[in-house]
């Protein structure tokens, strides 16, 4: 068995990579590892998205936790950032979110948070993994307890509402819940904000999460925004830790643009701590140039919101995120939060009194292409030293003449190598990306 924890916890197809036996072991091992570091009773919050497998995995995980004497509090269907927020609010020892984010319903995952609502550090995950891969967890005669929490949604939603600032209630908004976690919270949130909102894709059945809906499938949202002549469209992913938007014309406003809008607003109000925005190596070149033009320091990390957050904590920065819509507003949250992000943008939209398209136009997005090449798992550690791949990359970089960039990186959760190119012309970079992808596929493809 390979390494279980990826960049975003454990994830896989239910019944194959992720079984109830594994969930039981995760609960058992996590309770033992974290319990041995704490003198007080271990209290663990468990949330889940809307997948049919969520309840089964939550039950198995709960059994493992309780077998080590932990007190389990079931939050039910909530967004991932709700677990992160409530761990600290409820003074719990640990939080667990059962979700596979933007993946289809046959996938699920287990994400662990510490007592402050931060994702567990790699060292702690590695310690837990030793027990999952064979090391026996010491047994105990102490048995834990289980209870259902009926205040989680209200407590989380009220927290988001508290970050709103004079939002224009005349704004017409369409919200896509992706048949996921936001279905349980977004309608309540916008009702409390007193907004004119049309909510779509909220009637989940356990199988339709992310199915032609949400931040990975914006077509339906675009259609509704145009049809209803709405001011803005908002799309969440399956566990609502990311948010993408579309303007009044149905044009995408991605995570990079959201960060540009937010960081400039913070700078203008004197609140951009240490004058820095944190992105990743995958952030659009347009965001980097936007920061240069507006005298904002841009800090790039490895891909993954956990690495963005680590840099933010290390250097006391307050905003960071990814193009995919994972945006962290550190003054309010310890992880990416889709609903929080959407409220911050609505705050700015209301304050400026302009159309969403004008707000988003402050950043020029460079044409970008991303090709995912399916490869053998072991290839993710071999391609960098391959002479043919290196030659293909260098050839394309030379042709770009400094007006673009090439980035090749392995996926943290799947057997993929991602080929990303940015440049001035879409057709040109599409061809260049395919050249590199073809070389990788020929050498390392499945």
What are these regions (language model features)?
Residues 1-63, 67-68, 145-173, 380-381:
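An N-terminal, well-structured beta->alpha segment
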